[in-house]
Amino acid sequence: MKRIFILLSCTAALLLGACGKDSSLPAATGKASIRAINAIKTSGEFNFLIEERLIGPAAYAAATASAQYDDLDYTFNIEVFYAGETAFRRIASRFIDFEADKDYTLLVSGTLDNPALTLWVGDTRTFDEADTVFEAKFAHASASLGALDYYFADPTVAPALGDQVATLSFGEVSAATDLEAGDFVLTITTANNPTDVVYVSDTTTIGAQGAYIFIPFEGSAASTAPVLVRAINRIGNSISLPDPRFLPTVQFINASIDLGLSDIYDDELLTSRLVDNQDYLDVSAELEIPAGANTFYYTPSEDTAAVTLETSLTAFSGTRYRLVASGVAGAFSGTSLVPDRRPVATYAKLLPFQVSNNFGFVDIYVVAADTSIDDANPVLFGLAPTQLGAPVRLAAGSFDLYVTEFTQKVALAGPYRIDLALGDVVDMIVVDKADDPAVLDVLFLSGGPTP
C-alpha cells in the first residue's frame, strides 16, 4: 500500500506541475502584421510561411500579402521549388518575437544558395477618417548600388543637397514620415550628388490614408532600365513606378508567309521607316519607341502605295515588347506581347507562342532525349494561334521537343534536341513551314536546339 500511495502522489504532483505550466503560457495582448519582400534577382517565386503554414508567395521585386497574427513568437520560413525535385526546399528561417501594434517587413536578398534576411520593424499605422496624409518609407534593395539619396517632392522642385528625405545603404529602410496627399516625383541619386541620378519617376499622384514603402531593386531581362522601383502598400500590393528616361523597345517578327517581304513604318505618311526588307521569319533588332500609343504600318518592300497591315501598341517606359505579324492575305494581324525572359535559378523556362494558319490548337511535348511521346503527356496542351502560353518550368537535362496537333501523337514539328541548365530560357514560336503546309516549324529566339 505504501508503494501505491507514493506512486499516486508522484502522479498527482506531475499533473499539478503540468497544469501550472499550461497556465503560464504567454497570452496574446494584441496583433502585429508581417510581409516578406523578394529581392533575390535570380529567384522565381518563393513561399513565405509562418511555422509550417503558408502566408503567400512573392515574385522577384514584389511582396507577399500582409498577414496579421497574435503578439507571440514564431519562426518564419522561406521555401522555393526546384524543377525536378519532389518537395519545396527550405532556404532560410527567422525567429521573430512579435510585439503588439508593430508592422514587420522581412527583406529576403542575396542568393538562393546564400540568402540574407533583414528585418524592418515599424509601428502599425492607422488613420482617422479626416486625415489628409499618407505614410512613406524609403528602402534600398539594389545590391549593385552604393549609398543612395532619396528625394520625394513636388514635380516642380529639383533635387538639391540637403532636401533628401533619406540616405540609405543596401538593406536599410528609413523612418516613416507623413506627407500631404498630392503629386510627387521620386528621384534617387548617388549619395551627396544630386546631379548623379540613378532613377527618377514620372509624376505620381498619391492619395491620403495609405502607407507605402518605396524601394529600388536590380533591373531584369524584362526591362530596359537598370533599376526597378516599386511602391509596396500596407497590404503587400506592389505598384511599378517606371523610369521615363528609359524608352520601351519593340522587336518585330514576320510570321506570315503571305505578308511577304515588308517594310515597317511608324508614321501614317510612311516617311519614318523602322525596318526594311523583313522576310518570313526575319527578326528585327530591338528598337526604341516612344512610351504611349504607337501605330505601325507594314507595306510591301520599297512600295508605299498600299498598307498591308496596320497595328497598334501602347507601350510603357522600360518595357521590352515583341510584335509578331501573322495571318493570311486579307486577314493579317499584329500581336504584341512581353515574354517573361528573366532567367531564374530554380528551373529552365519554356516560353511558347504559336501563329500557325494551317493548324488550330497544338500540343507541345518535352520528353527525355530519345524517348517516344506515345506514353507522355504534353507540357502544354491546346495552345491556340496568337496565344502566348504560360511559361513552362523544366528541370535541367537533355530533352526532345515536339509539336503535335491537339490531342494527337503525330509530330508536326520536331524532335528538337534541347540541352537545358537551370536558368536557361527557351523562347520559341510555332510557325507554318514555308514549303510544306502539312507540317509545322519552330522559330527559336533563345535556347534552341543543340547544334
Predicted features along the sequence, with ranges:
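Sec-dependent bacterial lipoprotein signal peptides
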Residues: 1-18
